[in-house]
Design a protein with these regions (language model features):
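Peripheral, non-AAA+ core regions of ATP-driven protein-machinery
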Residues: 4-9, 15-31, 38-207
Length: 207
């Protein structure tokens, strides 16, 4: 009989498509969760202040139209609610900000990174970084509502793959998470958000 072990599988099928990579971290850096044609994936979002000469907002990362609109909504929402979240209300009045979603050669689209982008922008304004293994997904509206997204199973698996054990999901996706098999749900602490205030409270203790 032919015996096939881990080494043989790799020899036949090549290296794994997904590798276990440590999530990025730092001020203005937040880990989101995305669904792709190959399954779930973590989606880091970076925000940085380029200069303070004038107000401005730049997007990069090969983003589709829907994702660009999500970024603009996140920027408008956070910029108009900074004081409520404990940041300088005028921070974005004199800040040229660059928002980037890494792996620039990979096309990205959809609304589910809205809360992630908003959190990266708030992290930048507050000069506060996320120091624990936390990831999030959810569509954000201009008034701060958090709407449901698809691919919850794949996104949860993606979080587990990189060692993340805290998740922020839209409250409307609660049933989707609860329906997952126990072996997928096990070990996660999940926070459900109806509004962006719920997200900020988990991440920064604000709102």
């Amino acid at each position: 009989p032919i015996k096939i072990g881990v080494r043989e599988v790799e020899a036949y099928l090549d290296k794994p498509v997904f590798s276990r990579e440590k999530p990025m971290s730092g001020v203005g850096v937040v880990t989101g969760l995305a669904w792709t044609s190959m399954g779930g994936a973590t989606l880091p979002v970076e925000a940085t202040r380029v200069h303070t000469l004038n107000r401005g907002f730049k997007l990069t990362g090969k983003l589709g139209e829907v994702m660009k609109e999500s970024a603009e909504i996140a920027y408008s929402y956070i910029a108009s609610h900074l004081k409520a979240y404990g940041a300088d209300a005028k921070f974005y009045d004199t800040s040229f900000v660059h928002l980037h979603v890494p792996e620039g050669a990979t096309p990205k689209d959809g609304p589910s990174a809205g809360v992630t982008m908003a959190t990266a922008l708030l992290s930048l304004a507050k000069n506060a970084k996320i120091t624990r293994p936390l990831a999030m997904t959810g569509e954000l509206t201009l008034t701060g509502q958090v709407l449901p997204v698809g691919g919850i199973r794949e996104k949860v698996i993606a979080a587990r793959r990189v060692g993340i054990n805290e998740l922020i999901l839209p409250d409307a996706n609660r049933r989707d998470f609860d329906k997952l098999p126990e072996h997928i749900r096990a070990g996660f602490t999940v926070y459900y958000a109806k509004r962006y205030q719920d997200v900020a409270a988990v991440v920064f203790g604000a709102g």
